[in-house]
């Protein structure tokens, strides 16, 4: 997308996550709710249907895939340590870890709609950590736009705010 815009409007963030081997349900926390620690860097913990635990976070602002991948083992150990600090009684063993890159914007909202000066080019990007929600909203907005229907949410996520924040 950067090739079509007049300036950089997003930061690329490297992120890390792991999933445990299955854990006995009696060992899990009540309600198995999503846990989000808002420290910097943030930490999130949730369970899966098969009683596995997903731990993620340790984000860093850079986009070099080789550097990101080289940090995977170190970041996995940090995530494991943070989990064990919060839940020392839960038997926890990592089965798999992964990393990736996502983009975020200065105001935390994605850009959805036409590319400036290119009426037939649409973007839906910059979700931050909210890709499931924002990609669905983006698909709805763009689908309506292609049908000639105005979606008022498009004004919230439009490129017009570039001048305001960037």
Language-model features, listed with the residues they occupy:
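Active-site substrate-recognition segment that forms the wall
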Residues: 1-119
């Amino acid at each position: 997308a950067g090739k079509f815009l007049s300036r950089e409007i997003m930061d690329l963030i490297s992120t890390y996550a792991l999933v445990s081997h299955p854990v006995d349900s009696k060992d899990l926390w009540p309600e198995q709710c999503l846990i989000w620690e808002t420290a910097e860097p943030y930490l999130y913990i949730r369970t899966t249907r098969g009683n596995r635990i997903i731990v993620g976070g340790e984000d860093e602002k850079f986009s070099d895939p080789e550097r990101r991948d080289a940090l995977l083992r170190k970041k996995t150990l940090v995530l494991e340590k943070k989990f064990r600090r919060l839940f020392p009684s839960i038997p926890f063993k990592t089965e798999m870890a992964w990393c990736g890159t996502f983009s975020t914007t200065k105001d935390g909202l994605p850009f959805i709609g036409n590319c400036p000066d290119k009426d037939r080019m649409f973007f839906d990007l910059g979700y931050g950590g909210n890709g499931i929600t924002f990609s669905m909203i983006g698909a709805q907005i763009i689908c309506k736009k292609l049908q000639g229907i105005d979606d008022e949410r498009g004004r919230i996520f439009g490129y017009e705010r570039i001048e305001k924040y960037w």
